[in-house]
UniProtKB/Swiss-Prot annotation:
Gene3D superfamilies per record: Ribonuclease H-like superfamily/Ribonuclease H
GO term, biological process aspect, one: DNA recombination
Gene behind the chain: ruvC
Annotated protein name in UniProt: Crossover junction endodeoxyribonuclease RuvC
PANTHER family named in the record: CROSSOVER JUNCTION ENDODEOXYRIBONUCLEASE RUVC
Lineage top rank: taxon: Bacteria
Coiled coil feature spans: none
């Protein structure tokens, strides 16, 4: 059994999702958003760090999975996203959680079946896979999808010494 915390980083809204994996069964434990309403970037980063730390303390996850930075059209947006990711990652590392990163396309491919999926498709599939009564809000659904991706890929992956990764089917990664 493992508990996985997924994070969809953002400088204004950071989504989180927590699931438990037992074999192939995934169970929803919680999700939501850390909202930063201040304009001051250092204060936003502090709020993200504190929020992620609180979530880790509450749910005691075994793994931390986060979305990688994508190249935005606006370089300023990409920099802010990178800073938000950094605040969340530092919270995880400070609490000794192993960190895994996944590209948005890889998450969509794993959860929906196509890397070009729309947000509504991700929400629908997360709802279906976790047997939720309603679609989660978009940022929380993305975070849950990241956690689901981690569970799916970790089932097919063996960890070797020196952090080398080899897929169970024999393909080097």
């Amino acid at each position: 059994m493992a508990i996985v915390l997924g994070i969809d980083p953002g400088s204004r809204v950071t989504g989180y999702g927590v699931i438990r994996q037992q074999g192939r069964q995934l169970t929803y434990l919680g999700s939501g958003c850390i909202r930063t309403v201040v304009d001051d970037m250092p204060t936003r980063l502090k709020l993200i760090y504190a929020g992620v730390t609180e979530i880790i303390t509450q749910f005691q996850p075994d793994f931390f999975a986060i979305e990688q930075v994508f190249m935005a059209k606006n370089p300023d947006s990409a920099l802010k996203l990178g800073q938000a990711r950094g605040a969340a990652i530092v919270a995880a590392v400070n609490l000794n959680l192993p960190v895994s990163e996944y590209a948005a396309r890889q998450v969509k491919q794993t959860v929906v079946g196509t890397g070009a999926a729309e947000k509504s498709q991700v929400q629908h599939m997360v709802r279906s896979l976790l047997q939720l009564p309603a679609n989660p809000q978009a940022d929380a659904a993305d975070a849950l999808a990241i956690a689901i991706t981690h569970c799916h890929l970790s089932q097919n992956t063996l960890r070797l010494g020196n952090d080398q990764m080899v897929l169970a089917r024999g393909r080097l990664r």
